[in-house]
Amino acid sequence: MLVIPPGLSEEEEALQKKFNKLKKKKKALLALKKQSSSGPASQGGVKRSLSEQPVVDTATATEQAKQLVKSGAISAIKAETKNSGFKRSRTLEGKLKDPEKGPVPTFQPFQRSMSADEDLQEPSRRPQRKSLYESFVSSSDRLRELGQDGEEAEAPGAGDGPPRGFDWSYEEHGSARSSASPPRSRSRDRSHDRSRDRDRDKERDRDRDRDRDRDRDKDKDRDRDRDRDKERDRDRDRDRDRERDREGPFRRSDSFPERRAPRKGNTLYVYGEDMTPTLLRGAFSPFGNIIDLSMDPPRNCAFVTYEKMESADQAVAELNGTQVESVQLKVNIARKQPMLDAATGKSVWGSLAVQNSPKGCHRDKRTQIVYSDDL
């Protein structure tokens, strides 16, 4: 069972007081709103608020306006006739209306206020421009034209007026300004021009001297390089001569080929077509004892080995280029000499190797076995 206390708690009493205060404030606000809304209605007496006015169509509104215009309560609005085109400024319209009057003085914030005295003094303040003759003729030429008294001589055609090709308005202005300038300013300008010309001449001389020094340095460098190259070439030639002297006869070069020594040996190379062993033995046996004879029929050549080298040299001298039994022979000492040691007797087993060599005169004594086709 829940027990509810008969009285209100402190929090409930505080909330109830706040609620009563809010009610009072709300009533006061409603009263103020009513007074503000009833104020304009009581002052005018006729005006109504926009919310209270009835909504009227455009057609009914135009009819009501026409009736009011007819009754004279409202005057009709007149349309202004405007000229179509560009707008003209008011100052221009004033000038067109009153051409005798000058321009109306108006305030221009960014324009400098000038008086008549300042207008007269302005041309004297402007920097004097050189005349056309002075701009074309250098100051050095003008110094030459100066007389002994220091007065400037007349320019060509100056007495007759400006030259024909330079009849410009700029020349007239320049002559007027130069005539108006005092003689002191002229002398200052002349001295200033003289100093400028002197400075320019000095700078030119300095540049010329610098260029000359640079050219001299370049020439010296070139001469040094040439001397270095010459010394290098001399050193190379000396080194080559030293190498030649060191190598002597053992040196081989393509530019100076040396003649080889003649070959020596006891084996001969024989070339000829349709050669036979009997032909070779009959042709070469008179010159010495033959210890080996080998044939190479596909190449039409043969090798003949003597016991002594002297017999081989004699055979080459007599049989080279001769014709034996209608066979032209070419005889030379062979490049390879395999049986030289055996022939000279330096090797113990040389004779046996020569006798049993595959290219020697040894023939196989075995009989060849031939089988019948039936097997």
Swiss-Prot record:
Residues 30-58, 79-262 are annotated as: Disordered. There is a cross-link at K78, K82 (Glycyl lysine isopeptide (Lys-Gly) (interchain with G-Cter in SUMO2)). Signal peptide: none annotated. The keyword Repressor applies. The modification Phosphoserine is found at S51, S113, S115, S131, S139, S179, S181, S185, S187, S191, S253, S255, S285, S357. Residues 155-167 have a biased composition (Low complexity). GO terms for molecular function: chromatin binding; mRNA binding; RNA binding. The modification PolyADP-ribosyl glutamic acid is found at E122, E151, E172. InterPro entries: NELFE (IPR033102), NELFE_RRM (IPR034637), Nucleotide-bd_a/b_plait_sf (IPR012677), RBD_domain_sf (IPR035979), RRM_dom (IPR000504). Residues 90-101, 186-260 have a biased composition (Basic and acidic residues). Phosphorylated by the P-TEFb complex at sites next to its RNA recognition motif, promoting its release from chromatin. It comes from the Eukaryota. Sequence repeats lie at residues 184-185, 186-187, 188-189, 190-191, 192-193, 194-195, 196-197, 198-199, 200-201, 202-203, 204-205, 206-207, 208-209, 210-211, 212-213, 214-215, 216-217, 218-219, 220-221, 222-223, 224-225, 226-227, 228-229, 230-231, 232-233, 234-235, 236-237, 238-239, 240-241, 242-243, 244-245, 246-247. Its main location: nucleus. SUPFAM superfamilies: RNA-binding domain, RBD (SSF54928). Essential component of the NELF complex, a complex that negatively regulates the elongation of transcription by RNA polymerase II. The NELF complex, which acts via an association with the DSIF complex and causes transcriptional pausing, is counteracted by the P-TEFb kinase complex. Provides the strongest RNA binding activity of the NELF complex and may initially recruit the NELF complex to RNA. This is Negative elongation factor E.
